[in-house]
């Protein structure tokens, strides 16, 4: 967990036994599924587990548990990190390629969820649409993690800000400038930055602005945490004064036909 010092910066400290939080049986579909305190506790847990891994100390907290990894989109990092992560925690992952399931074609997304919940303790999906993620969660009694969809990429945002915090110690009052499309990554980052009190500047090409509904959600959160959100087509203006520059891919997955534009 974290404590707030007199100037408002969040400092990492070891959580007391009574302060342990639980996300048991909770889905992670969006950054909005997490409170600020849950984000802080996740970061503290991640730091603890990373320290154990670096010291080669076993931390098999998911001994005997299984993870289903459902992929409609290929990914090196998503598959590698989830598969290694569950292994280091003592569990086991099963990887499903697109042709293994064919979500919504060979059988409905709901039926897939009903089957998976009987065999697995946890489901991670990397899929085309947010509706697929939602349908899996609505029909599953085991937790579903959004490993990427067209609307959000919450796991990437969490690991990115955790890494930034490792280097800068505090996030509150810092500014992250994102240069790229207003896509799923930008959506999750702007929501998460707002939650932790970090300013977020987004520079995107005309016609590739973020979802207005998500911008409104982030602005509402930012108003409560004292952070600021700016969206512009001017990368130089958005990068000026930033503590972190974040550049995404120039052509988002699924938009390859627009590369020449």
Residue ranges and their predicted role:
Residues 23-80, 84, 152:
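Positively charged, low-complexity intrinsically disordered leader regions
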Residues 121-192:
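Anion-binding alpha/beta catalytic cores of soluble intermediary-metabolism enzymes, centered on
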Residues 94-116, 139, 189-192, 210-224:
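Active-site-proximal loop->helix
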Residues 72-84, 166-248, 253:
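Glycine-rich phosphate/diphosphate-binding loop of Rossmann-like nucleotide-binding domains
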Residues 66-67, 71-119:
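Active-site cofactor/substrate anionic-group-binding motifs, chiefly glycine-
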Residues 117, 137, 238-240:
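A short, aliphatic-rich alpha-helical micro-motif
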């Amino acid at each position: 967990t974290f404590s707030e010092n007199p100037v408002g910066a969040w400092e990492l400290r070891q959580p007391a036994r009574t302060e342990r939080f639980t996300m048991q049986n909770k889905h992670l579909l969006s950054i909005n599924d997490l409170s600020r305190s849950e984000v802080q506790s996740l970061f503290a847990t991640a730091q603890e587990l990373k320290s154990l891994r670096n010291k080669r100390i076993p931390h098999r907290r998911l001994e005997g548990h299984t993870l289903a990894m459902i992929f409609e989109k290929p990914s090196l990092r998503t598959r590698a990190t989830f598969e290694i992560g569950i292994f280091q925690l003592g569990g086991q992952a099963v990887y499903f390629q697109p042709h293994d399931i064919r979500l919504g074609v060979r059988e409905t997304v709901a039926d897939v969820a009903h089957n998976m919940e009987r065999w697995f303790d946890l489901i991670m999906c990397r899929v085309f649409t947010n509706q697929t993620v939602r349908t899996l969660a609505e029909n599953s009694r085991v937790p579903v993690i959004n490993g990427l969809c067209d609307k959000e990429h919450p796991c990437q945002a969490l690991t990115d800000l955790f890494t930034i915090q490792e280097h800068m110690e505090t996030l509150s009052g810092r500014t992250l400038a994102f240069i790229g499309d207003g896509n799923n990554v930008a959506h999750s980052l702007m929501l998460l930055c707002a939650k932790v009190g970090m300013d977020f500047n987004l520079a995107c090409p005309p016609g590739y602005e973020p979802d207005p509904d998500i911008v409104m959600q982030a602005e509402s959160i930012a108003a409560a945490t004292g952070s600021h959100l700016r969206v512009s087509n001017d990368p130089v203006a958005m990068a000026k004064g930033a503590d972190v520059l974040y550049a995404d891919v120039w052509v988002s997955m699924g938009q390859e036909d627009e590369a020449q534009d």
